[in-house]
Amino acid sequence: MSLMQFSGLLVVWLLSTLFIATLTWFEFRRVRFNFNVFFSLLFLLTFFFGFPLTSVLVFRFDVGVAPPEILLQALLSAACFYAVYYVTYKTRLRKRVTDVPRKPLFTMNRVETHLTWVMLMGIALVSVGIFFMHNGFLLFRLHSYSQIFSSEVSGVALKRFFYFFIPAMLVIYFLRQDSKAWLFFLVSTVAFGLLTYMIVGGTRANIIIAFAIFLFIGIIRGWISLWMLVAAGVLGIVGMFWLALKRYGLNVSGDEAFYTFLYLTRDTFSPWENLALLLQNYDNIDFQGLAPIVRDFYVFIPSWLWPGRPGIVLNSANYFTWEVLNNHSGLAISPTLIGSLVVMGGALFIPLGAVAVGLIIKWFDWLYELGNRETNRYKAAILHSFCFGAIFNMIVLAREGLDSFVSRVVFFLVIFGACLLVAKLLFWLFDCAGLVHQRAKPQPQTQVEG
């Protein structure tokens, strides 16, 4: 890459970043937080944060990358995607009405809410316990990270239930919403994340999500300022780099440490070059249509329920890894949101996907606003826990693609909804048995004048 080509890419990157950052800043000033703000920051991180890292790798360490014209296409496609997404998100097809009372779809009481978070936490802890009994601490047993996907590890499906610990802790926080509950959320979820990191063998998702939710709650409540958020972000990047070194068993120093930091940070937070690789091999892609979305549900179907279930699921990530990169190491490499759309239907699917994502984020913001307006604090805690608990799925959306997001958000909805239904059933049984008692309201103290 010549300096002239880099200069052209830099101009496009600066304009695109300024465009998205400006819209995000205006939205932040207006509402302080909603899921449009979160997705916009996540989109910036995924598709634009990595450009400076790539530039240093190219000019400092002479690392090979895709041709400049392909990198330009990747930057422009990301900017155009966001423009279509933003217009979709902001467009209203009918007048907003907030004063018309509507019959609530469901309601919650104190006992049902506590039963819900206990079951969510129980699902996570029991799954971790069973996985640990089968495999022990994989971080200290396995020699390479790719081994966690091998036949040496049993009970892999249980990992999908670990994440429900976070929504359980979110319910506890939203019932109190004070600084002590906020700090308790951080300590409990990060401790659980570190435990699963050691048990699973290097998976950092629970730690990243817990820390991100903690920061956004702090922003919403005014406990964290913007400069503190930036400082925490830098600390998070360094922390994730250290965990990555431990995960891959790397011992580096000097220039090698700087090089390792650059490419691991880029791959962890901003795999934008994967989109460029897909665009570089565009003519060789056999478009998969909507099949990757359907196939991604296969992993949630137990083999005893479907004996003939395919052992290999060809979703967009695996198609990118196996067919485009010809990588059969056992790891699935993230194609990114836009990359998954390219795999499914080429350039035509990019604006269609942007419209779909705009509607998805709008739906989450509708739920979030519903929780903000809710007068029943127990129902509000459940709604907010569901919305913030789905942040993990939004990160999957940006990094892994639309197919992975759809299957995971449906799975999350089913398990979360099942816990709500079971909680209501248990409350009904307890109530029928006379085990539920109303809390006595404290009597007002009367002051006796002497």
UniProtKB/Swiss-Prot annotation:
InterPro entries: WzyE (IPR010691). Pathway: Bacterial outer membrane biogenesis; enterobacterial common antigen biosynthesis. One of its GO terms (cellular component) is plasma membrane. The chain crosses the membrane at residues 6-26, 37-57, 63-83, 120-140, 155-175, 181-201, 207-227, 228-248, 341-361, 378-398, 410-430. GO terms for biological process: enterobacterial common antigen biosynthetic process. Its main location: membrane. It is found in: Cell inner membrane. It is a multi-pass membrane protein. Pfam families: WzyE (PF06899). Probably part of a complex composed of WzxE, WzyE and WzzE. NCBIfam families: PRK02975.1 (NF002820). Belongs to the WzyE family. HAMAP family: WzyE. This is Probable ECA polymerase. The lineage of its organism: Bacteria, Pseudomonadati, Pseudomonadota, Gammaproteobacteria, Enterobacterales. The gene is wzyE.
